[in-house]
Amino acid sequence: MGIDISCLNFIASHKQYVKGKTLQIGRQGLHYAGSWADRSGKKAIISNKILSDHNINFTAQDTVEGGDGHTEKLFKLLGADTVDTIDYSPYEGCTIVHDMNKPVDEIYHDAFDYILDAGTIEHIYDVKTVIDNYKIMLKVGGTIAIITTCNNFAGHGFYQFSPEFFRTVFSKQAGYQQLGLDIYELTSDESFEAYHIAEPRKGDRQEFKTSPNPHYVAFVAKKIKNIDSSNFQQSDYLKVWGEL
């Protein structure tokens, strides 16, 4: 797992929400800064432009220096006070060992101001429990950001996700304010196109035809209040059933 240039752009686009107690779902590597042998290479140049375009006053190289190839320094430079990582195994140096197929311990309830999943959820079997864990670990007023596989990643993980999934499970009715929903088309290892997904008319189905390139879905939302919401239906079917 790691932060590539498209993930960096996504994080930079909502940088103001990275603060306080931050949690990574799986420890993230620095994939955007180029190789360790050439930190001034093309990826680093592109990454620096992304940071500059989002009015961020440090460089990709700053996030690498003095670190071990992971993203804790990036998040602290963005504004996090502490950065924890939860993972199934300690093999990559996580601070919390937990199987996300199971509910998290109460000590992690309402514990974090910012949670980032950058490519983990698609590898976990029990997606409902994963989402429930994210919700219960996030403080009211905190922000959840998820970037995961959307299309042309068959075989990468267990799942690929539709934008509709995140829009539904983190809806206003579930206690969240949507801050951003995008699709990232990976046109090469060093380039991407980002497409903002507008809110559809109530109950309308929103389908997307994509190119043969791999695509991520990227979603960010703010938790407004705690609501016990665990049963969701797709909005266009609710419209058909007369329940919207």
Regions found by a protein language model. Name each.
Residues 29, 90-92, 102, 183-188:
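Residue-level detector of flexible, active-site-proximal loop/helix-junction positions
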